[in-house]
Amino acid sequence: MSSEGGGKSAPQIPDGLIEELSVELQGEDAPFASSMERDLELKWSEEGESRLGFTRFECDHNEIYRRRRLGVPPGPVTIALNPILKDDTALFRHTLAHELLHAAGLLDHDDLHARIVSKVAPAPKLRDSPVLMRLREQVLEGLPEGQWICGKCGHTWERRRVTRPARCPKCASRFEAK
């Protein structure tokens, strides 16, 4: 595995993560798993990147599916992780496991992909993740309305969540926005 830092140290794969993923991938259709570490470059993405991580193969998607079908190694693979993950070990591990599965040949976000990631590196709870809390605050700040108003009783309360509440906390009627 190579890594280029450009002045900042490149991310490192936590001890045992590749081995845990390899165990879970036994018997599954993951044609690049055996060559995953050989041509893998791990780096930090650019500041301001909106994604937590991404996997990039050097060849186009048609060639990747052809190589997957033929069982041929994919060639050089780059996994870029968002630098904000430096502050959150659990989310870093979860995101890296997700991207390593793509590098192993699980290209789709299906049930198998989700099951393996949640078993090997479960996503942290919102309250346990400083990065997720920060991202949640950014989303809430960007919403046009800062409060909810019940259409039935007129009760007003501060908006702390992105999704619409099911019921008014005062009158308990089904929530209808005013």
Task: Describe the residue ranges of each PLM region.
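Active-site recognition of the HExxH zinc-binding catalytic motif
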Residues: 94-106
